[in-house]
C-alpha cells in the first residue's frame, strides 16, 4: 500500500514538472507580436539583483544582457551584441524586427542568477514559427494569371474591332437602301434581238 502511494506521488510530481507548474515556465507567453516585429519576453524572479540574460536562437547567442548592482543603488546594464532590449522589474524584453520564414527556430532565454546566491541557471524557450506573408504569396500567384488574362482580352478586343469594322464597311457597300446604288456595267456594243423582228 505504501509503495502504491509513493508511485502516485511520483506520478503527480512528474506531471507537474512536465506541465511547467513548478518552475513557472508555462505560465506566461514568451512571444508577442509588436510593431511589425516580435517581442521575446524573458522573465526572472523579483528578488534577483544581479543576473545575465542571453537570448539564444538554437545554439547561437543573439543577445546578451547583464545587470549588475555596484556600490550604492546604481545599476549598469551591458549589452554585448547589437540588439534592442528593454529591462523591467521582473522581465527582459528582446525585440527582433524584419523577420521572414528563415528565422523560424527554437528561441531560448538563458538566465544566470548571480545574486542572491546560490548561482543558478534556468533555460526557458519555445518555437517561433513565422509564416510567409499571405498577400505576397497571393500576388506571386495571381500576377502572371492577371497579366495573361489582360493580354487575351486585348487581343480579343482588337479582333472584334477589326471584324466589326470590316462587317460595317462590307455591308455599306452592298446596302440596297443606300443613297447610292451600284449598277452593273452595261455593254452598249451589243444589238438588241428585237430589232430584227417585224410586226
From Swiss-Prot:
Pfam families: V-set_2
Tissue-wise expression: Activated T-cells. Highly expressed on tonsillar T-cells, which are closely associated with B-cells in the apical light zone of germinal centers, the site of terminal B-cell maturation. Expressed at lower levels in thymus, lung, lymph node and peripheral blood leukocytes. Expressed in the medulla of fetal and newborn thymus.
Sites where a glycan is attached: 89, 110
Record's comment on post-translational modification: N-glycosylated.
Ig-like V-type domain span: 30-132
Inducing factors: By phorbol myristate acetate (PMA) and ionomycin. Up-regulated early on T-cells and continues to be expressed into the later phases of T-cell activation.
Classification via InterPro entries: ICOS, Ig-like_fold, Ig_V-set
GO BP, sorted A to Z: cell-cell adhesion; immune response; T cell costimulation; T cell tolerance induction; T follicular helper cell differentiation
Disease: Immunodeficiency, common variable, 1: A primary immunodeficiency characterized by antibody deficiency, hypogammaglobulinemia, recurrent bacterial infections and an inability to mount an antibody response to antigen. The defect results from a failure of B-cell differentiation and impaired secretion of immunoglobulins; the numbers of circulating B-cells is usually in the normal range, but can be low.
Record-given protein name: Inducible T-cell costimulator
Gene expressing this chain: ICOS
Amino acid at each position: 500500500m505504501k509503495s502504491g502511494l509513493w508511485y502516485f506521488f511520483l506520478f503527480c510530481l512528474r506531471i507537474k514538472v512536465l506541465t511547467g507548474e513548478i518552475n513557472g515556465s508555462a505560465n506566461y507567453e514568451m512571444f508577442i507580436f509588436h510593431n511589425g516585429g516580435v517581442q521575446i519576453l524573458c522573465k526572472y524572479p523579483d528578488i534577483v539583483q544581479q543576473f545575465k540574460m542571453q537570448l539564444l536562437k538554437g545554439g547561437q547567442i543573439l543577445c546578451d544582457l547583464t545587470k549588475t548592482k555596484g556600490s550604492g543603488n546604481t545599476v549598469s546594464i551591458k549589452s554585448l551584441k547589437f540588439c534592442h532590449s528593454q529591462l523591467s522589474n521582473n522581465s527582459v524584453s528582446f525585440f527582433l524586427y524584419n523577420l521572414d520564414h528563415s528565422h523560424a527556430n527554437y528561441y531560448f532565454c538563458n538566465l544566470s542568477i548571480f545574486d542572491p546566491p546560490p548561482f543558478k541557471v534556468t533555460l526557458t524557450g519555445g518555437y517561433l514559427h513565422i509564416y510567409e506573408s499571405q498577400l505576397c504569396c497571393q500576388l506571386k500567384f495571381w500576377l502572371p494569371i492577371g497579366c495573361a488574362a489582360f493580354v487575351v482580352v486585348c487581343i480579343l478586343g482588337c479582333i472584334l474591332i477589326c471584324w466589326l469594322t470590316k462587317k460595317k464597311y462590307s455591308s455599306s457597300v452592298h446596302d440596297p437602301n443606300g443613297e447610292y446604288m451600284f449598277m452593273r456595267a452595261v455593254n452598249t456594243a451589243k444589238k438588241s434581238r428585237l430589232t430584227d423582228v417585224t410586226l
